Amino acid sequence: MITVALAKGALLKDSVTRFAKAGLDFSAVLDPSNRQLMVPSECGRAKALLVRNGDVPVYVAYGQAQLGVVGFDVLSEHQMPVANLVDLSFGECHMAVAVKETSHYRSAADLPAHCRVASKFTNCARRFFEDIDLPVELVHLTGSVELGPLTGMAEAIVDLVATGRTLRENGLIEIDHLFDSTARLIGHPLSLRLDSGDLRSVVEAMNTNDKSIPFK
């Protein structure tokens, strides 16, 4: 039986739609009355694990799920040993550096050395600032990072941006771009190598009109 890790939240509906097109119907997870965290597919040959976004690559890396759907932002932050199989082309957003619009900073390079930067994605932020050779103090937050600059705790934030509305409504502007992010189909490397064909058929079906990274 194929086990698929699905992230609760914004990516769930589109993930279920894509798996349905590949022959795996997990629509039961969209039922508001559902309280199960392990849900079988209608065909009975697969089951879905409903987990938090950041836990998807963990379940896949440890082989408790053979496939999963997660944002590229999460893959970049945690860098778990999983196979990045298909760019599913939904859940589009990007990682950016933002500051108060009243500040004089117009690029990350303008920020003062050793300033505080708030983020949920401290690993992504660390690599970015190391790449531009700017030492900063990273402050890890789990929500509402926009409050960092507004309260004076941080000069800047590194966060995901979709429409930019939250930034605008809180008087913040983007000053640098780290990378674009979309939902990705990921796989457990050993399971893919030992696959008798079931996993490959699902991956190929989900790869229709999308970008894939062939696996061996």
Swiss-Prot record:
Give each disulfide bond as a residue pair: none
Task: Say yes or no: keyword Protein biosynthesis present.
Answer: no
Native species of this protein?
Answer: Prochlorococcus marinus (strain MIT 9211)
Q: Which residues cross the membrane?
A: none
- Family stated for the protein in its record: Belongs to the ATP phosphoribosyltransferase family. Short subfamily.
One record GO biological process? L-histidine biosynthetic process
Q: What is this protein called?
A: ATP phosphoribosyltransferase
The pathway to which it is assigned is: Amino-acid biosynthesis; L-histidine biosynthesis; L-histidine from 5-phospho-alpha-D-ribose 1-diphosphate: step 1/9
Which E.C. number(s) belong to this protein?
2.4.2.17
- Respond yes or no to whether keyword S-adenosyl-L-methionine is given for this record: no
**Cellular component per GO?**
cytoplasm
- Entry remark concerning the domains of this protein: Lacks the C-terminal regulatory region which is replaced by HisZ.
Which keywords are on file for this protein? Amino-acid biosynthesis, ATP-binding, Cytoplasm, Glycosyltransferase, Histidine biosynthesis, Nucleotide-binding, Transferase
What subcellular compartments does it reside in?
Answer: Cytoplasm
Q: Which GO terms describe its molecular function?
A: ATP binding; ATP phosphoribosyltransferase activity
SUPFAM superfamilies registered for this protein in UniProt: Periplasmic binding protein-like II (SSF53850)
Q: Which InterPro entries match?
A: ATP_PRibTrfase_cat, ATP_PRibTrfase_CS, ATP_PRibTrfase_HisG, ATP_PRibTrfase_HisG_short
